[in-house]
């Protein structure tokens, strides 16, 4: 935000120079980005009056003038400006004057005519880029007065970065409040005398969306002269704030916007049919905006309409049809409080960012509307004439923001600041900030001012007290603390160790947003309710993630769109699952997830191109699980997941509890997300794995191991993992290894069945096993498989 230093000093004028003022504003939390003079360096320019203006005898585009600058004679000056005319008060650079760029004014002859000075434009004085003509001063500008003094050009433009929580400082009044508080000075506000109604003209106003528009004020002003010139003082204040003068009506609403921080709008009353209706847009409704573009409105967009059509996007941009033009005589002034949530994101959807939407998205003082309406009415009538009707106020108190009541404890204040501030100082600071304060024993009850949306909790008051007291006034004190060594159990498995393993396997770690697109998330987790944000960055980031897959799959698409088809990425982070049993109704689980797609290996002349499959990812996952020492306790079970391919996925169970999923992304989901080719994902609940099984030292057998192979025929739906698990359980004392080395379907095996070839490794730590013992153990395994799975030995 830009503003004039002199305009600020009209409200509060501390006895400090510009640099100190800028530093003070920065230390108050409103970072000053720049301080620049409002005009170039020049001297010798005064107010003059063109007494005579005649055509130059030797040049069609030049005029010969006689100018009164308050001296004992008139000056002959040749001027080429198209707006030069008799009776005009102008800025005159006299002989000896020096203009910006070290341009010195001397007596000269132009096409044979003497010229004893120069009539200046704004650009020639370094005030603005306007070089369309010479400066036109008011008719009462005192002749001979230094133009720097008359236009108050010994001024600076201060530009500040206003953080989103300090919307109250998007007007001169807000910055002035802070400066007044910091310097313990009174705030000198302009006198705003209510304008009484002199006519009875009104328009009916209906608010159909009170949640989006808790307060709407409208006032008819009739008989205005829209062509009346905007006063130079107002033009200059607008210019120094970076706003170009348009016409008197628009300039007045912009002036109130900059002064009080309250957006306003003026409608051409004669173009409104019936009355004003504040409602949500109809799906597909269109509106031609003031810039001539057509906006297609969504049902969640607030509009100001008449009885037949939309007139404006509420709090964002006016419509062309109802806008003020050169023929306008009667206007309806609008001043409203729109809920920030009803405005947020709507302007960006249409490629807009207006001064009004910028303020409404952050929050406007809900108690400001009557004051702004009276200020705008007075300025409009003073400049354009006309008569005002009564103010129509439609307010829904139930939906207006409520002022927060906050308890500030002395113990909390001292602990967070680390310094004791006297009670009377704390009370004084809070009251100067605009709070209604009630003192108690070692605490304060403060009711936040209506313009401070960011004062909600105790820490906010602590911050305000410290800010106003001055961070530099808080003494440096060494921290007194004792160091306690953190305990580290042998069973603790660092997530960093797992990340290193995945890095070694070619994965890259990514970090994605916890805020995701609710529509995409519903594709991945259909029917699962997510936590929605009340004030999202955008609609596409309005839900908290239910898993890490949403962000990871979006990252894959992003990379594939940039010709990176072989992707291996992983992420660790929290998911947010609604749970009525959890604190605040949300369960936060630390998850580890990964995605792979593309070729199994990097391109190589000696390797065939093979696409990754389920077993590639399962193998990587087993390596991770092996680090935990719990691989032998993990089961991969066939279980449906709407995001995964039903025939190429599995749920992961640890001791009967599901801890994750692994599998190929469902083909339908691949299509919807525009994934290129087969994509595989996994996700694990990390906290259920972080407590690893500590390796136990055991004796290594000095006796030979024996291998026996068996082939068993089982039904197609029997998982091979269950077969291996049963063999391990039966041969627990002698079977030290079980491995599946072949799966066969075809000739010799009935349809609906499969043959599993299994190797059994048998060994004892105390002796060499006899053949009879080996045969007995193998037979025991076969019998167990036959009994549980109706397996039979294959011939």
UniProtKB/Swiss-Prot annotation:
Keywords: Aminoacyl-tRNA synthetase, ATP-binding, Cytoplasm, Ligase, Magnesium, Metal-binding, Nucleotide-binding, Protein biosynthesis, RNA-binding, tRNA-binding
One of the record's GO molecular function terms: phenylalanine-tRNA ligase activity
GO annotation, cellular component aspect: cytosol; membrane; phenylalanine-tRNA ligase complex
Location relative to the cell: Cytoplasm
Binding of Mg(2+), residues: 454, 460, 463-464
Catalyses which reaction(s): tRNA(Phe) + L-phenylalanine + ATP = L-phenylalanyl-tRNA(Phe) + AMP + diphosphate + H(+)
EC annotation from Swiss-Prot or TrEMBL: 6.1.1.20
GO biological process, one term: phenylalanyl-tRNA aminoacylation
Domain tRNA-binding, first and last residues per copy: 39-148
Cofactor(s), by name: Mg(2+)
Domain (B5) ranges: 401-476
Cofactor note: Binds 2 magnesium ions per tetramer.
Domain FDX-ACB: 701-794
Family: Belongs to the phenylalanyl-tRNA synthetase beta subunit family. Type 1 subfamily.
Oligomeric form and interacting partners: Tetramer of two alpha and two beta subunits.
PANTHER family the UniProt entry points to: PHENYLALANINE--TRNA LIGASE BETA SUBUNIT, PHENYLALANYL-TRNA SYNTHETASE BETA CHAIN AND LEUCINE-RICH REPEAT-CONTAINING PROTEIN 47
Protein name, UniProt field: Phenylalanine--tRNA ligase beta subunit
Name of the coding gene: pheT
């Amino acid at each position: 935000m830009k503003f004039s230093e002199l305009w600020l000093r009209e409200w509060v004028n501390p006895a400090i120079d510009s640099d100190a003022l800028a530093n003070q504003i920065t230390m108050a939390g409103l970072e000053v980005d720049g301080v620049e003079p409002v005009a170039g360096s020049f001297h010798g320019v005064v107010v003059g009056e063109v007494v005579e203006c005649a055509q130059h005898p030797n040049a069609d585009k030049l005029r010969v003038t006689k100018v009164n600058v308050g001296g004992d004679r008139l000056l002959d000056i040749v001027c080429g400006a198209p707006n030069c005319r008799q009776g005009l008060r102008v800025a005159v650079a006299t002989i000896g004057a020096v203009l910006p760029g070290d341009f010195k004014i001397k007596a000269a002859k132009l096409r044979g005519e003497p010229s004893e000075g120069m009539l200046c434009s704004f650009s020639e004085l370094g005030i603005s880029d306007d070089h369309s003509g010479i400066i036109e001063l008011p008719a009462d500008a005192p002749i001979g007065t230094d133009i720097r003094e008359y236009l108050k050009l010994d001024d600076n433009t201060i530009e500040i970065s206003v953080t989103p929580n300090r919307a109250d400082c998007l007007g001169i009044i807000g910055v002035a409040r802070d400066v007044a508080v910091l310097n313990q000075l009174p705030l000198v506000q302009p006198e705003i005398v209510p304008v009484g109604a002199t006519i009875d003209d009104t328009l009916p106003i209906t608010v159909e969306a009170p949640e989006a528009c808790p307060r709407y004020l409208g006032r008819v002003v009739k008989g205005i002269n829209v062509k009346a010139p905007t006063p130079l003082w107002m033009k200059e204040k607008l210019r120094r704030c970076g706003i170009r003068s348009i016409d008197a009506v628009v300039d007045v609403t912009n002036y109130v916007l900059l002064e009080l921080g309250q957006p306003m709008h003026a409608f051409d009353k004669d173009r409104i049919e019936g009355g004003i209706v504040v409602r949500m847009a109809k799906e597909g409704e269109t509106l031609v905006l003031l810039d001539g573009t057509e906006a297609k409105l969504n049902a969640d967009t607030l509009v100001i309409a008449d009885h037949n059509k939309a007139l404006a996007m509420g709090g964002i941009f006016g419509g062309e049809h109802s806008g003020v033009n050169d023929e306008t005589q009667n206007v309806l002034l609008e001043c409203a409080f729109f809920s920030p949530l009803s405005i947020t994101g709507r302007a960006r959807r249409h490629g807009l960012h207006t001064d009004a939407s910028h303020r409404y998205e952050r929050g406007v003082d809900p108690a400001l509307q009557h004051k702004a309406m009276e200020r705008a009415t007075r300025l409009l009538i003073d400049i354009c004439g006309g008569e005002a009707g009564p103010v129509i106020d439609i307010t829904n108190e139930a939906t207006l923001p409520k002022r927060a009541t906050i308890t500030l404890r002395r113990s909390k204040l001292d602990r967070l600041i680390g310094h004791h501030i006297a009670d009377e100082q704390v009370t004084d600071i809070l009251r100067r900030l605009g709070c209604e304060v009630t003192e108690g024993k070692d605490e304060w009850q403060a009711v936040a001012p209506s313009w401070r949306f960011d004062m909600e909790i105790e820490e906010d008051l602590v911050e305000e007290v410290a800010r106003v007291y001055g961070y530099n006034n808080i003494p440096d004190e060494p921290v007194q603390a004792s160091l306690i060594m953190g305990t580290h159990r042998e069973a603790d498995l660092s997530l960093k160790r797992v990340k290193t393993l995945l890095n070694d396997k070619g994965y890259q770690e990514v970090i994605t947003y916890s805020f995701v697109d609710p529509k995409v998330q519903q594709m991945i987790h259909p029917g699962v309710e997510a936590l929605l944000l009340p004030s999202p960055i955008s609609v596409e980031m309005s839900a908290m993630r239910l898993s890490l897959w949403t962000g990871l799959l979006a990252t894959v698409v992003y990379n594939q769109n940039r010709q990176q088809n072989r992707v291996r990425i992983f992420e660790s982070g929290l998911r947010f699952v609604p749970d009525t049993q959890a604190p605040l109704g949300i369960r936060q689980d630390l998850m580890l997830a990964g995605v792979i797609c593309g070729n199994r290996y990097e391109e190589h002349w000696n390797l065939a191109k093979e696409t990754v499959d389920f077993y590639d990812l399962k193998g990587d996952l087993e390596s991770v699980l092996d680090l935990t020492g719990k691989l032998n306790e993990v089961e991969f079970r066939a279980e449906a997941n709407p995001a995964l391919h039903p025939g190429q996925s599995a749920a992961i169970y640890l001791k009967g509890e599901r801890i994750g999923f692994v599998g190929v992304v469902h083909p339908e989901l691949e299509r919807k997300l525009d994934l290129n080719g087969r994509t595989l994902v996994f996700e694990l609940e990390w906290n259920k794995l972080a407590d690893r099984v500590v390796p136990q030292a055991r004796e290594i057998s000095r006796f030979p191991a024996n291998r026996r192979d068996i082939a068993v025929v089982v039904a197609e739906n029997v998982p091979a993992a269950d077969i291996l698990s049963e063999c391990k359980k039966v041969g627990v004392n002698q079977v030290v290894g079980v491995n599946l080395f072949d799966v066969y379907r075809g000739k010799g095996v009935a349809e609906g069945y499969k043959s599993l070839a299994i190797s059994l490794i048998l060994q004892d730590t105390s002796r060499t096993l006899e053949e009879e013992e080996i045969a007995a153990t193998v037979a025991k395994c076969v019998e167990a498989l036959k009994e549980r799975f109706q397996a039979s030995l294959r011939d």
